[in-house]
Structures are given as C-alpha cells and as structure tokens.
Amino acid sequence: MNMDINTKKRFTEYLTELHRLNKKHGFTIDNAEVFDKGSFSGYIEVTRESMSIVLDDIVTLEIETDSID
C-alpha cells in the first residue's frame, strides 16, 4: 500500500470522529462509503459494534464501540 503517514493520520482522525458521533447519536451507515484517492482505494464501514476502514483490501483501522468516548 502506497500511503504516507499524514494521509493515514487524516483518515484515522476522520474515522475516530465519525465513530464518536455514531456512538453519541446512534446513527448507522447501512452501506459502506467507497472511495478512491489516487494511489489507493477502499471503503469505510460503520456498524453499531465497530467501524473499520479497508484500503487496498487490507483492514487498516478497526474501532470497537467501547473504545471511543
């Protein structure tokens, strides 16, 4: 996977905030958000139990509901 540390950090921050809002407000995203950012592609999936980001078919971040306040 060809992704620099700043890109990984931005995705981590985005997903952490998205998951915090999901836990606080109880919304769910039924369909994964698919994205293509040049050198990599993947999707974001949010459920009530966890949130994960998959880049180039590799799970790069997975957060369980209880790990975010």
What are these model-derived regions, one by one?
Residues 2-31, 62:
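N-terminal acidic leader/helix
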Residues 30-69:
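Detector for the mature cores of small, proteolytically processed
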